[in-house]
């Protein structure tokens, strides 16, 4: 399904083309899965300034943040973190790393929203095409290409300025694209500078800066060959005051630095083997550096923690179309390989005691191999798509002889496993306007570095965290059925889904009584058993031109309701309250327009929380108003007033472990934003 925001200027339908769900160019109405699309137009019209805004109007999709490092992961239908595969230009992003404290963490994704062309969200298991980590879905970001600025010309670009009062952020973006012969190029840069969120709490002073540089070269060698080079550099920095029990004068500095470089080759080979071959080779390197300064008594302490994730990825795909009698076949098959290393070094400097150096995860390495095959079979109005994939993975903990966590080096072992996953999807075209779709899909997720090897010894305080290389891979099976309607004034979708998950991995206390030294608690990541998630989603978009005396009115509405239980029939806290978004648009023929959005989120009651100590949250209704004006063809001015009624509310993902009220975690109060963008 396309983006469920309330947007003006463009009436979208299910004609939107998606790639990620099937690895083919398919219109949404012909896709046997629930797929959402956010376009660059949607991002502009909603005045999105960060990942925390990107999915705000999309029921069933949310983000999880922490107060120090910001957005950490994306939640789809109650599944999040490393259970959601995140791609940027086809490149799988680094693992989310949660250290158990605020000193060092690594987010699942870092991308600037000004440089996004489209985001595809595949809801539900998708491992048969994309392998491990897609057990709960996929979020695929596509950055802008030179052609998006050139628009048939030899030169183009934009200059953009934005200010947002919610965190006093100024952002500037510039893009330059050029075409010389068959070579197209793009250089784009975005800079953001801001402060702490202006919410209903009393947040300490903080400052943030973000830099994103995107470079692309695309060369059409001839009719059969196209080569593309891309580079993406990100550097984000945050400084702020912190609070730790027993410490004073605590401050932090967090720096994220990421490089992504790749080459892609598209070959229209037109042979018996395949009609086309697409392959890409990419290198991704990400480093998180967290520095914490604090004072306790006479001791001045500095924690300098580093987490690195670096590796290569290769992906290839062959496409082949065949017509056999009364059936049409579209085959997609290929292979993938990845090799990456993880490093974590935590240094502690003390003025009045000994310095320390520890790690949460040893310097480990991982290799993954994958083979996949899919056949899209069309017979008349019926399309059925079977697919299968094989994956193998190997993880090596490296040298753990200097392990300072209190665990023996023999506790860290190599890990390897393999898995087959399948998918069967179908679409039945009732007529030109109505379609039914259904799919059964399997998912799996190999244990990640953190789950296999995380360790930390603190027996003096009554606990030791031990590695567990005996984990099993998580697996799932998902069922979905839906109906779509699409015509020239309206589009609708209703889908119901049910997913079973097995061998879920979570951290648990496996023994011990939390008695310091003599009987500390032993904690590990373990396979805890089963979980079930089910729900229903609905959306509708309608142009009112045939019903109103004045043209330009349209509306959109979307809702998502999800339930989740573990194997003991206890509610899953990762499932968000049900959500409804309604938007009403008016676009004048005089180059201006406005949008009113109402975003309702239900309460999270104690009966829906698997912990009596966690605080429930109240329902909230948030109203946003945006408007645009084009004084000349290439200049667009926008203004927005958000949370018009100054509603005090929480994002459930951010407070689902909270046992006492903390208004520092509330969302922004009434705030405003302005944007000016000039295209040339």
Language-model features, listed with the residues they occupy:
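Short loop/turn motifs that connect adjacent beta-strands in outer-membrane beta-barrel proteins
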Residues: 9-11, 130, 146-155, 182, ...
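Acidic, small-polar-rich N-terminal luminal/periplasmic segments of exported/outer-membrane proteins
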Residues: 10-149, 168, 481
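Periplasmic-side early beta-strands and strand-to-turn transitions of outer-membrane beta-barrels
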Residues: 102, 128, 140, 146-148, ...
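Flexible loop and strand-edge segments within Gram-negative outer membrane beta-barrel domains
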Residues: 194, 200-201, 206-208, 224-274, ...
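Outer-membrane beta-barrel signature, preferentially recognizing the C-terminal barrel domain
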Residues: 247-272, 307, 360-366, 412-421, ...
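Signature of Gram-negative outer-membrane beta-barrel scaffolds
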Residues: 328-434, 457
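Gram-negative outer-membrane beta-barrel transporters
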Residues: 378-384, 393, 491, 497-501, ...
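C-terminal beta-signal and adjacent terminal beta-strands/loops
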Residues: 444, 502-503, 507, 603-606, ...
């Amino acid at each position: 399904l396309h983006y469920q925001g309330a947007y003006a200027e463009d009436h979208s339908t299910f004609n939107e083309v998606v790639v990620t769900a099937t690895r083919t160019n398919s219109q949404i109405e012909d896709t046997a899965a629930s797929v959402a699309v956010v376009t660059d137009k949607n991002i502009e019209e909603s005045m999105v300034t960060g990942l925390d805004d990107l999915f705000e109007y999309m029921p069933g999709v949310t983000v999880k943040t922490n107060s120090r490092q910001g957005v950490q992961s994306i939640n789809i239908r109650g599944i999040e973190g490393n259970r959601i595969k995140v791609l940027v230009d086809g490149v799988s992003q680094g693992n989310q790393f949660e250290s158990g404290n605020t000193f060092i963490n690594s987010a699942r994704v870092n991308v600037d929203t000004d440089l996004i062309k489209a985001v595809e969200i595949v809801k539900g298991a998708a491992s048969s095409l994309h392998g491990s980590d897609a057990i709960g879905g996929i979020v695929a970001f596509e950055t802008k290409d030179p052609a998006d600025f050139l628009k048939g010309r030899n030169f183009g670009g934009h200059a953009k300025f934005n200010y947002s009062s919610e965190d006093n952020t100024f952002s500037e973006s510039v893009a330059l694209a050029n075409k010389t012969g068959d070579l197209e190029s793009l250089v784009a840069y975005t800079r953001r500078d801001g402060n702490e969120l202006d919410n209903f709490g009393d947040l300490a002073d903080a400052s943030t800066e973000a830099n994103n540089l995107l470079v692309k070269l695309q060369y059409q060698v001839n009719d059969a060959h196209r080569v593309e080079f891309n580079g993406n550099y990100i550097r984000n920095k945050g400084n702020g005051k912190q609070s730790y029990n027993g410490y004073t004068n605590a401050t932090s500095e967090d720096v994220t630095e990421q490089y992504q470089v790749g080459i892609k080759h598209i070959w229209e080979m037109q042979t018996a083997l395949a009609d086309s071959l697409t392959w890409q080779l990419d290198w991704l390197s990400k480093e998180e550096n967290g520095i914490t300064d604090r004072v306790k008594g006479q001791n001045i302490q500095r924690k300098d923690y580093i987490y690195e994730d670096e590796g290569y990825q290769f992906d290839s795909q062959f496409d082949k179309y065949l017509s056999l009698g009364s059936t049409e076949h579209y085959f997609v098959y290929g292979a993938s390989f990845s090799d990456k290393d993880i490093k974590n070094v935590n240094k502690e400097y003390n003025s009045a005691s000994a310095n320390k150096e520890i790690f949460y995860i040893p310097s480990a390495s991982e290799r993954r191999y994958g083979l996949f095959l899919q056949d899209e079979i069309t017979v008349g109005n019926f399309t059925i798509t079977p697919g299968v994939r094989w994956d193998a993975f190997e993880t090596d903990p490296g040298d753990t002889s200097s392990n300072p966590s209190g665990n023996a080096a023999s506790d860290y072992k190599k890990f390897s496993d393999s898995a087959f996953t399948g998918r069967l999807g179908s679409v039945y075209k009732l007529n030109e306007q109505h379609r039914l779709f259904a799919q059964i899909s399997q998912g799996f997720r190999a244990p990640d570095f953190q789950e296999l090897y995380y360790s930390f010894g603190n027996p003096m305080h009554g606990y030791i965290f031990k590695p567990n290389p005996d984990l099993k891979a998580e697996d799932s099976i998902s069922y979905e059925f839906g109906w779509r309607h699409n015509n020239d004034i309206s589009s609708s979708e209703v889908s119901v889904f049910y997913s079973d998950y097995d061998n879920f991995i979570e951290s648990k206390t496996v023994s011990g009584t939390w008695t310091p030294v003599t009987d500390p608690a032993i904690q590990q990541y373990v396979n805890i058993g089963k979980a079930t998630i089910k729900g229903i989603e609905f959306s509708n978009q309608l142009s009112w031109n045939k019903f109103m005396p004045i043209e330009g009115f349209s509306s959109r509405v979307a809702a998502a309701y999800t339930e989740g239980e573990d194997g003991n029939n206890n509610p899953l806290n990762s499932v968000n309250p049900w959500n409804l978004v309604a938007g009403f648009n008016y676009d004048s023929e005089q180059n201006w327009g406005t949008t009113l959005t109402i975003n309702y989120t239900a309460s999270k009651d104690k009966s829906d929380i698997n912990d009596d100590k966690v605080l429930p949250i109240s329902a909230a209704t948030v109203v946003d108003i945006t408007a645009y004006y084009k004084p000349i063809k290439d200049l667009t001015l926008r203004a927005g007033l958000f949370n018009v009624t100054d509603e005090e509310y929480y994002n459930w993902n951010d407070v689902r472990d909270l046992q006492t009220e903390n208004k520092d975690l509330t969302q922004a109060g009434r705030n405003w934003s302005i944007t000016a963008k000039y295209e040339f």
